[in-house]
Amino acid sequence: MGDILKGRIPNKLVPLKHKVDGRWVDLGLGTISPIRDDAGNVQLRIFTRLDEPQYKISPYKELFTDKEIERLETDGHLGSTKKMKDFTSGRECECYVSVHEATNRLTTLPVDALTLPTRIYGKEIGDDIEALRSGKEIFIEDIHLKDGRVISGHARVDANRGDVVFRNDNNPHLRIHDTVFGVKISADIQAKLA
C-alpha cells in the first residue's frame, strides 16, 4: 500500500480478475498503480505481468540501441537518460529508465522531477552529482557511520523507487553464523560463504 501512495508500482503481484457480462475473467498476475492522465487526473491502472520484458516488444525495441537493451537486461537500469514519453505524466522529456522486475515493464522518471541530494550518509557528493544527474552510477567511499563503521558503495537513480538508491558494497546484512541447525561450520566453509 505504501508504494501505491508514493506513486510507485508495487512489487507484490496478486491474481487479478475482471467481471465481464456477469462472468469473472482471469487476467493473470498483476498489480495496481496510480497514473496521471493528460488532463492531470490520477487514475488507478492495472499492470499485468508481461511474458517478456517491455523493451523487447514493439515499439520499445526500436527505441533502444543494442547496448542499452543489454544494460537493461543485466542491470535493470539504463545507466543514462533517454528522451522518451514519461509513463506517469504522459509528456515527452529526458527520463531515467528502469525495468520493474515483478511486471517486466519499463518505468520512467523525468530528470526534472527529481531533486538530487548533495550528501549521502553525510558524505559530500561533490562533482559526481553531474554524473548522477546523467543517469550514471557513482562510487562513494569512506562513509563514516554513527556506529563507527566505514562503508563504501554505489549510488544511482532508480526510476522504480523514484529516488537515488545506495548499494552498500561492504554488505553488512550478510552474516555467516558459526552453526547451521546446530552443526558447527568450519572456518574454511565460513570463508567460502563470505
Where are these regions (language model features)?
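Gram-negative host-targeted secretion-system effectors, predominantly Type III and Type IV
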Residues: 1-194
